[in-house]
Structures are given as structure tokens and as C-alpha cells.
Amino acid sequence: LPLNTGLASATDNCDPAPVVTYSDATVAGECPQEYSITRTWTATDACGNSSTCSQSVIVEDTTVPTITSCPPDVTVECDESTDPMNTGLASATDNCDPAPVVTYSDATVGGQCPQEYTITRTWTATDACGNGTNCIQIITVDDSTPPTITDCPADVTIECDETTDPGNTGLASATDNCDTAPVVTYSDLTLEGGCPQEYTITRTWLATDACGNSSTCSQIITVDDSTPPTITTCAANITIECDESTDPSNTGLSSATDNCDPAPVVTYSDATVAG
């Protein structure tokens, strides 16, 4: 309006108050908010005599939009989405464009492990004339959740001649929210039992993901010796003279084997009946 862009004034040799009017011719610019006006001012006296002058009014958009809401920095778990719907959206206003366009671009830097990284998200608000401004949001992706041991082997009792290898006593398995293949290991603590062939193993299973988060479970393996030895050679019945020795070295020895004890002890006792 002329109140903002300037008013024309005129004088006349006879008319003390010539009428001043204007008309505008508008030419569009390179964007919707820019254009130029050729304003023609006309001064007319009471007798219809007139004169004109021209004014050029150039309308520009050089003001960048204002980002009214830049999402705050945020930390999310590695199994969460980094989509703006989860991490936050930016919004903007502009002095001329009613709907400035808001976009973003990401620059990702790896962390200490494969599942951890940092995103520098640059939000940019641009109006229809290409004026732009930006703000920065930092998105930190962490892996702080330990694996879940989905199958911890049950406590088990085995014979002393059986293997305590997990292939026999049971294997643990695990899943993780981010690592597709958490590592499962175990360690054993052995407590001796009442005899050399009997003992108890406390087996601690450990599931660890690529970021070092871990969880454990325990399995008790009881090793028993409940199988008696086998007498492999029993001394045969025998008849001897009364002046011969009844010692086993003369009458025969028995021998035995055992599933666990390499040297079972063989003893004997006698019951005598008079002839």
C-alpha cells in the first residue's frame, strides 16, 4: 500500500487541491512471494488536466522460515525405529509462505559395537522462494538390553561313566533384541562328592551380545556312581586234600571290573560247615 511504499503529491496553478490517484501493473517474480509493481500516479485538476509519474515497487522474499519446533536430542534402543514418527518431527512457519517445506537428512557415525550408532539429523525448512534454515537433532542408538536365554538346560543326574559334555547334559540357547546371534558359553564349578566317582557340577551358562550385554542361568549336573562292579571271574568250585591250603592263591582268585572305578576291591568271606 502507498502508506508503506510512499505517496505522491501534486500542485496546480489554479486548482488548490488536484486529485492524486494511482493504478498498479503487477508482474510475477521467480517465486510466488516475489513480484514487481509498476505504480502509475496521476494528478488531475478540476478542469481534467492531468500529469503522471511512475514508481517501481519491488516485492522480495529474503526472510528465512522459522523452525518453531526442533525435535530434542533423543536416545533410543537399537530395536526401536529412528523414523521421525518415533524420534520427533520438526515444524516451521514463514513470514510469506503459509506452508514452508520441512525435510531432513541423516549422517550416521558407528558406535562401540555394531548395534550402537549416532545419527546427526539436520532438519531444513525452505520456503517457496528458496530461503532456508536448519536445526540439528542428535539421535543416539544404544544397545542396553541383555540377551534372553530362551532354553536353559534342566538340572540332570547322570552316571559316572557318562560324559558331562553339553551334548549329553543339554545345551542353552538365547535370543537378543538386536544381535541375531548372541554368543552362548558356559563355565563349570565342580564340588566333590562322597566318593571319587561322584561329584556335582554347577554349570553357569552365559549369553552375550555384540555390545557386551549378558545374562546367565545355572544348571546343576549331579554325577552318581550307582552301578555295582561286575565280577568277571569268579573262582570255580574245587575239592582239595585236607592238608592243602584253603588260601585263594591255592583255591582260585576272583576278579572284577567297574564302570567308573578302574580298580574295584575284591574281598572274600568264608562260611565253614563241618563234614
Regions found by a protein language model. Name each.
Residues L1-G275:
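Proline-threonine-serine-rich low-complexity tracts
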